[in-house]
């Protein structure tokens, strides 16, 4: 009688442990696959570089920036709608693997991530390769930054997407900031305030972009 109770108790314990392990395995598969730090399914595509997952998490693609779409009464930028449409085609409703940038969130609280489809397609890179995004440096992981920079250089050479647009008010030179990886027009107050040891001069807008610097938001070089 005593041993029957012991055996029944152990059977119950084993069953409970088994169920716990099953739940743990399922939970783990929803957050980490193939080395990704998170996993999620896309509910909504906001624009070319931002998505919302089914759990409500907002994700900003690390190291890239796409043109703005019309919002809050503001007009959209050239290729903004095309970038969003391309992003939708890539990710809408799909499961994604996310690898977080060194700085995991931006000042809006969005996750900063390198995003991959289940077949390994690098979403950030696809947008850059097609000329729908330019580089903007976060706390970048070197391996992805170098890949994205090479893709941008190729898109620049081929004048794809945003790189097919004429340069607005070209300058004789541009001022870059080696600390922020941003470049400005020569008369821009933000460029002029750059410390001498951080300042770099580019002969053209193309040269600044080729080196991975992003255009300043105020003077829009």
Region locations from a protein language model:
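Small beta-barrel nucleic-acid-binding modules, primarily SNase/OB-fold domains
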Residues: 2-221
């Amino acid at each position: 009688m005593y041993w029957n109770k012991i055996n029944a108790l152990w059977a119950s314990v084993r069953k409970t442990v088994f169920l716990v392990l099953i739940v743990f395995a399922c939970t783990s598969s929803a957050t980490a696959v193939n080395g990704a730090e998170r996993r999620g399914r896309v509910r909504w595509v906001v624009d070319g570089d931002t998505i919302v997952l089914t759990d409500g998490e907002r994700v900003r693609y690390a190291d890239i920036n796409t043109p703005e779409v019309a919002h809050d009464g503001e007009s959209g930028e050239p290729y903004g709608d095309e970038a969003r449409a391309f992003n939708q085609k890539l990710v809408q409703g799909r499961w994604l693997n996310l690898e977080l940038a060194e700085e995991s969130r931006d000042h809006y609280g969005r996750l900063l991530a390198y995003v991959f489809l289940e077949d390994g397609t690098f979403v950030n890179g696809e947008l850059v390769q097609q000329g729908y995004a330019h580089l903007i440096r976060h706390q970048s992981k070197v391996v992805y930054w170098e890949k994205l920079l090479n893709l941008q250089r190729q898109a620049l050479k081929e004048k794809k997407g945003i790189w097919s647009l004429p340069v607005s008010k070209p300058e004789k030179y541009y001022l870059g900031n080696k600390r922020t990886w941003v470049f400005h027009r020569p008369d821009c107050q933000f460029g002029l305030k750059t410390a001498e040891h951080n300042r770099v001069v580019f002969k053209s807008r193309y040269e600044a972009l080729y080196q991975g610097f992003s255009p300043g938001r105020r003077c829009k070089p």
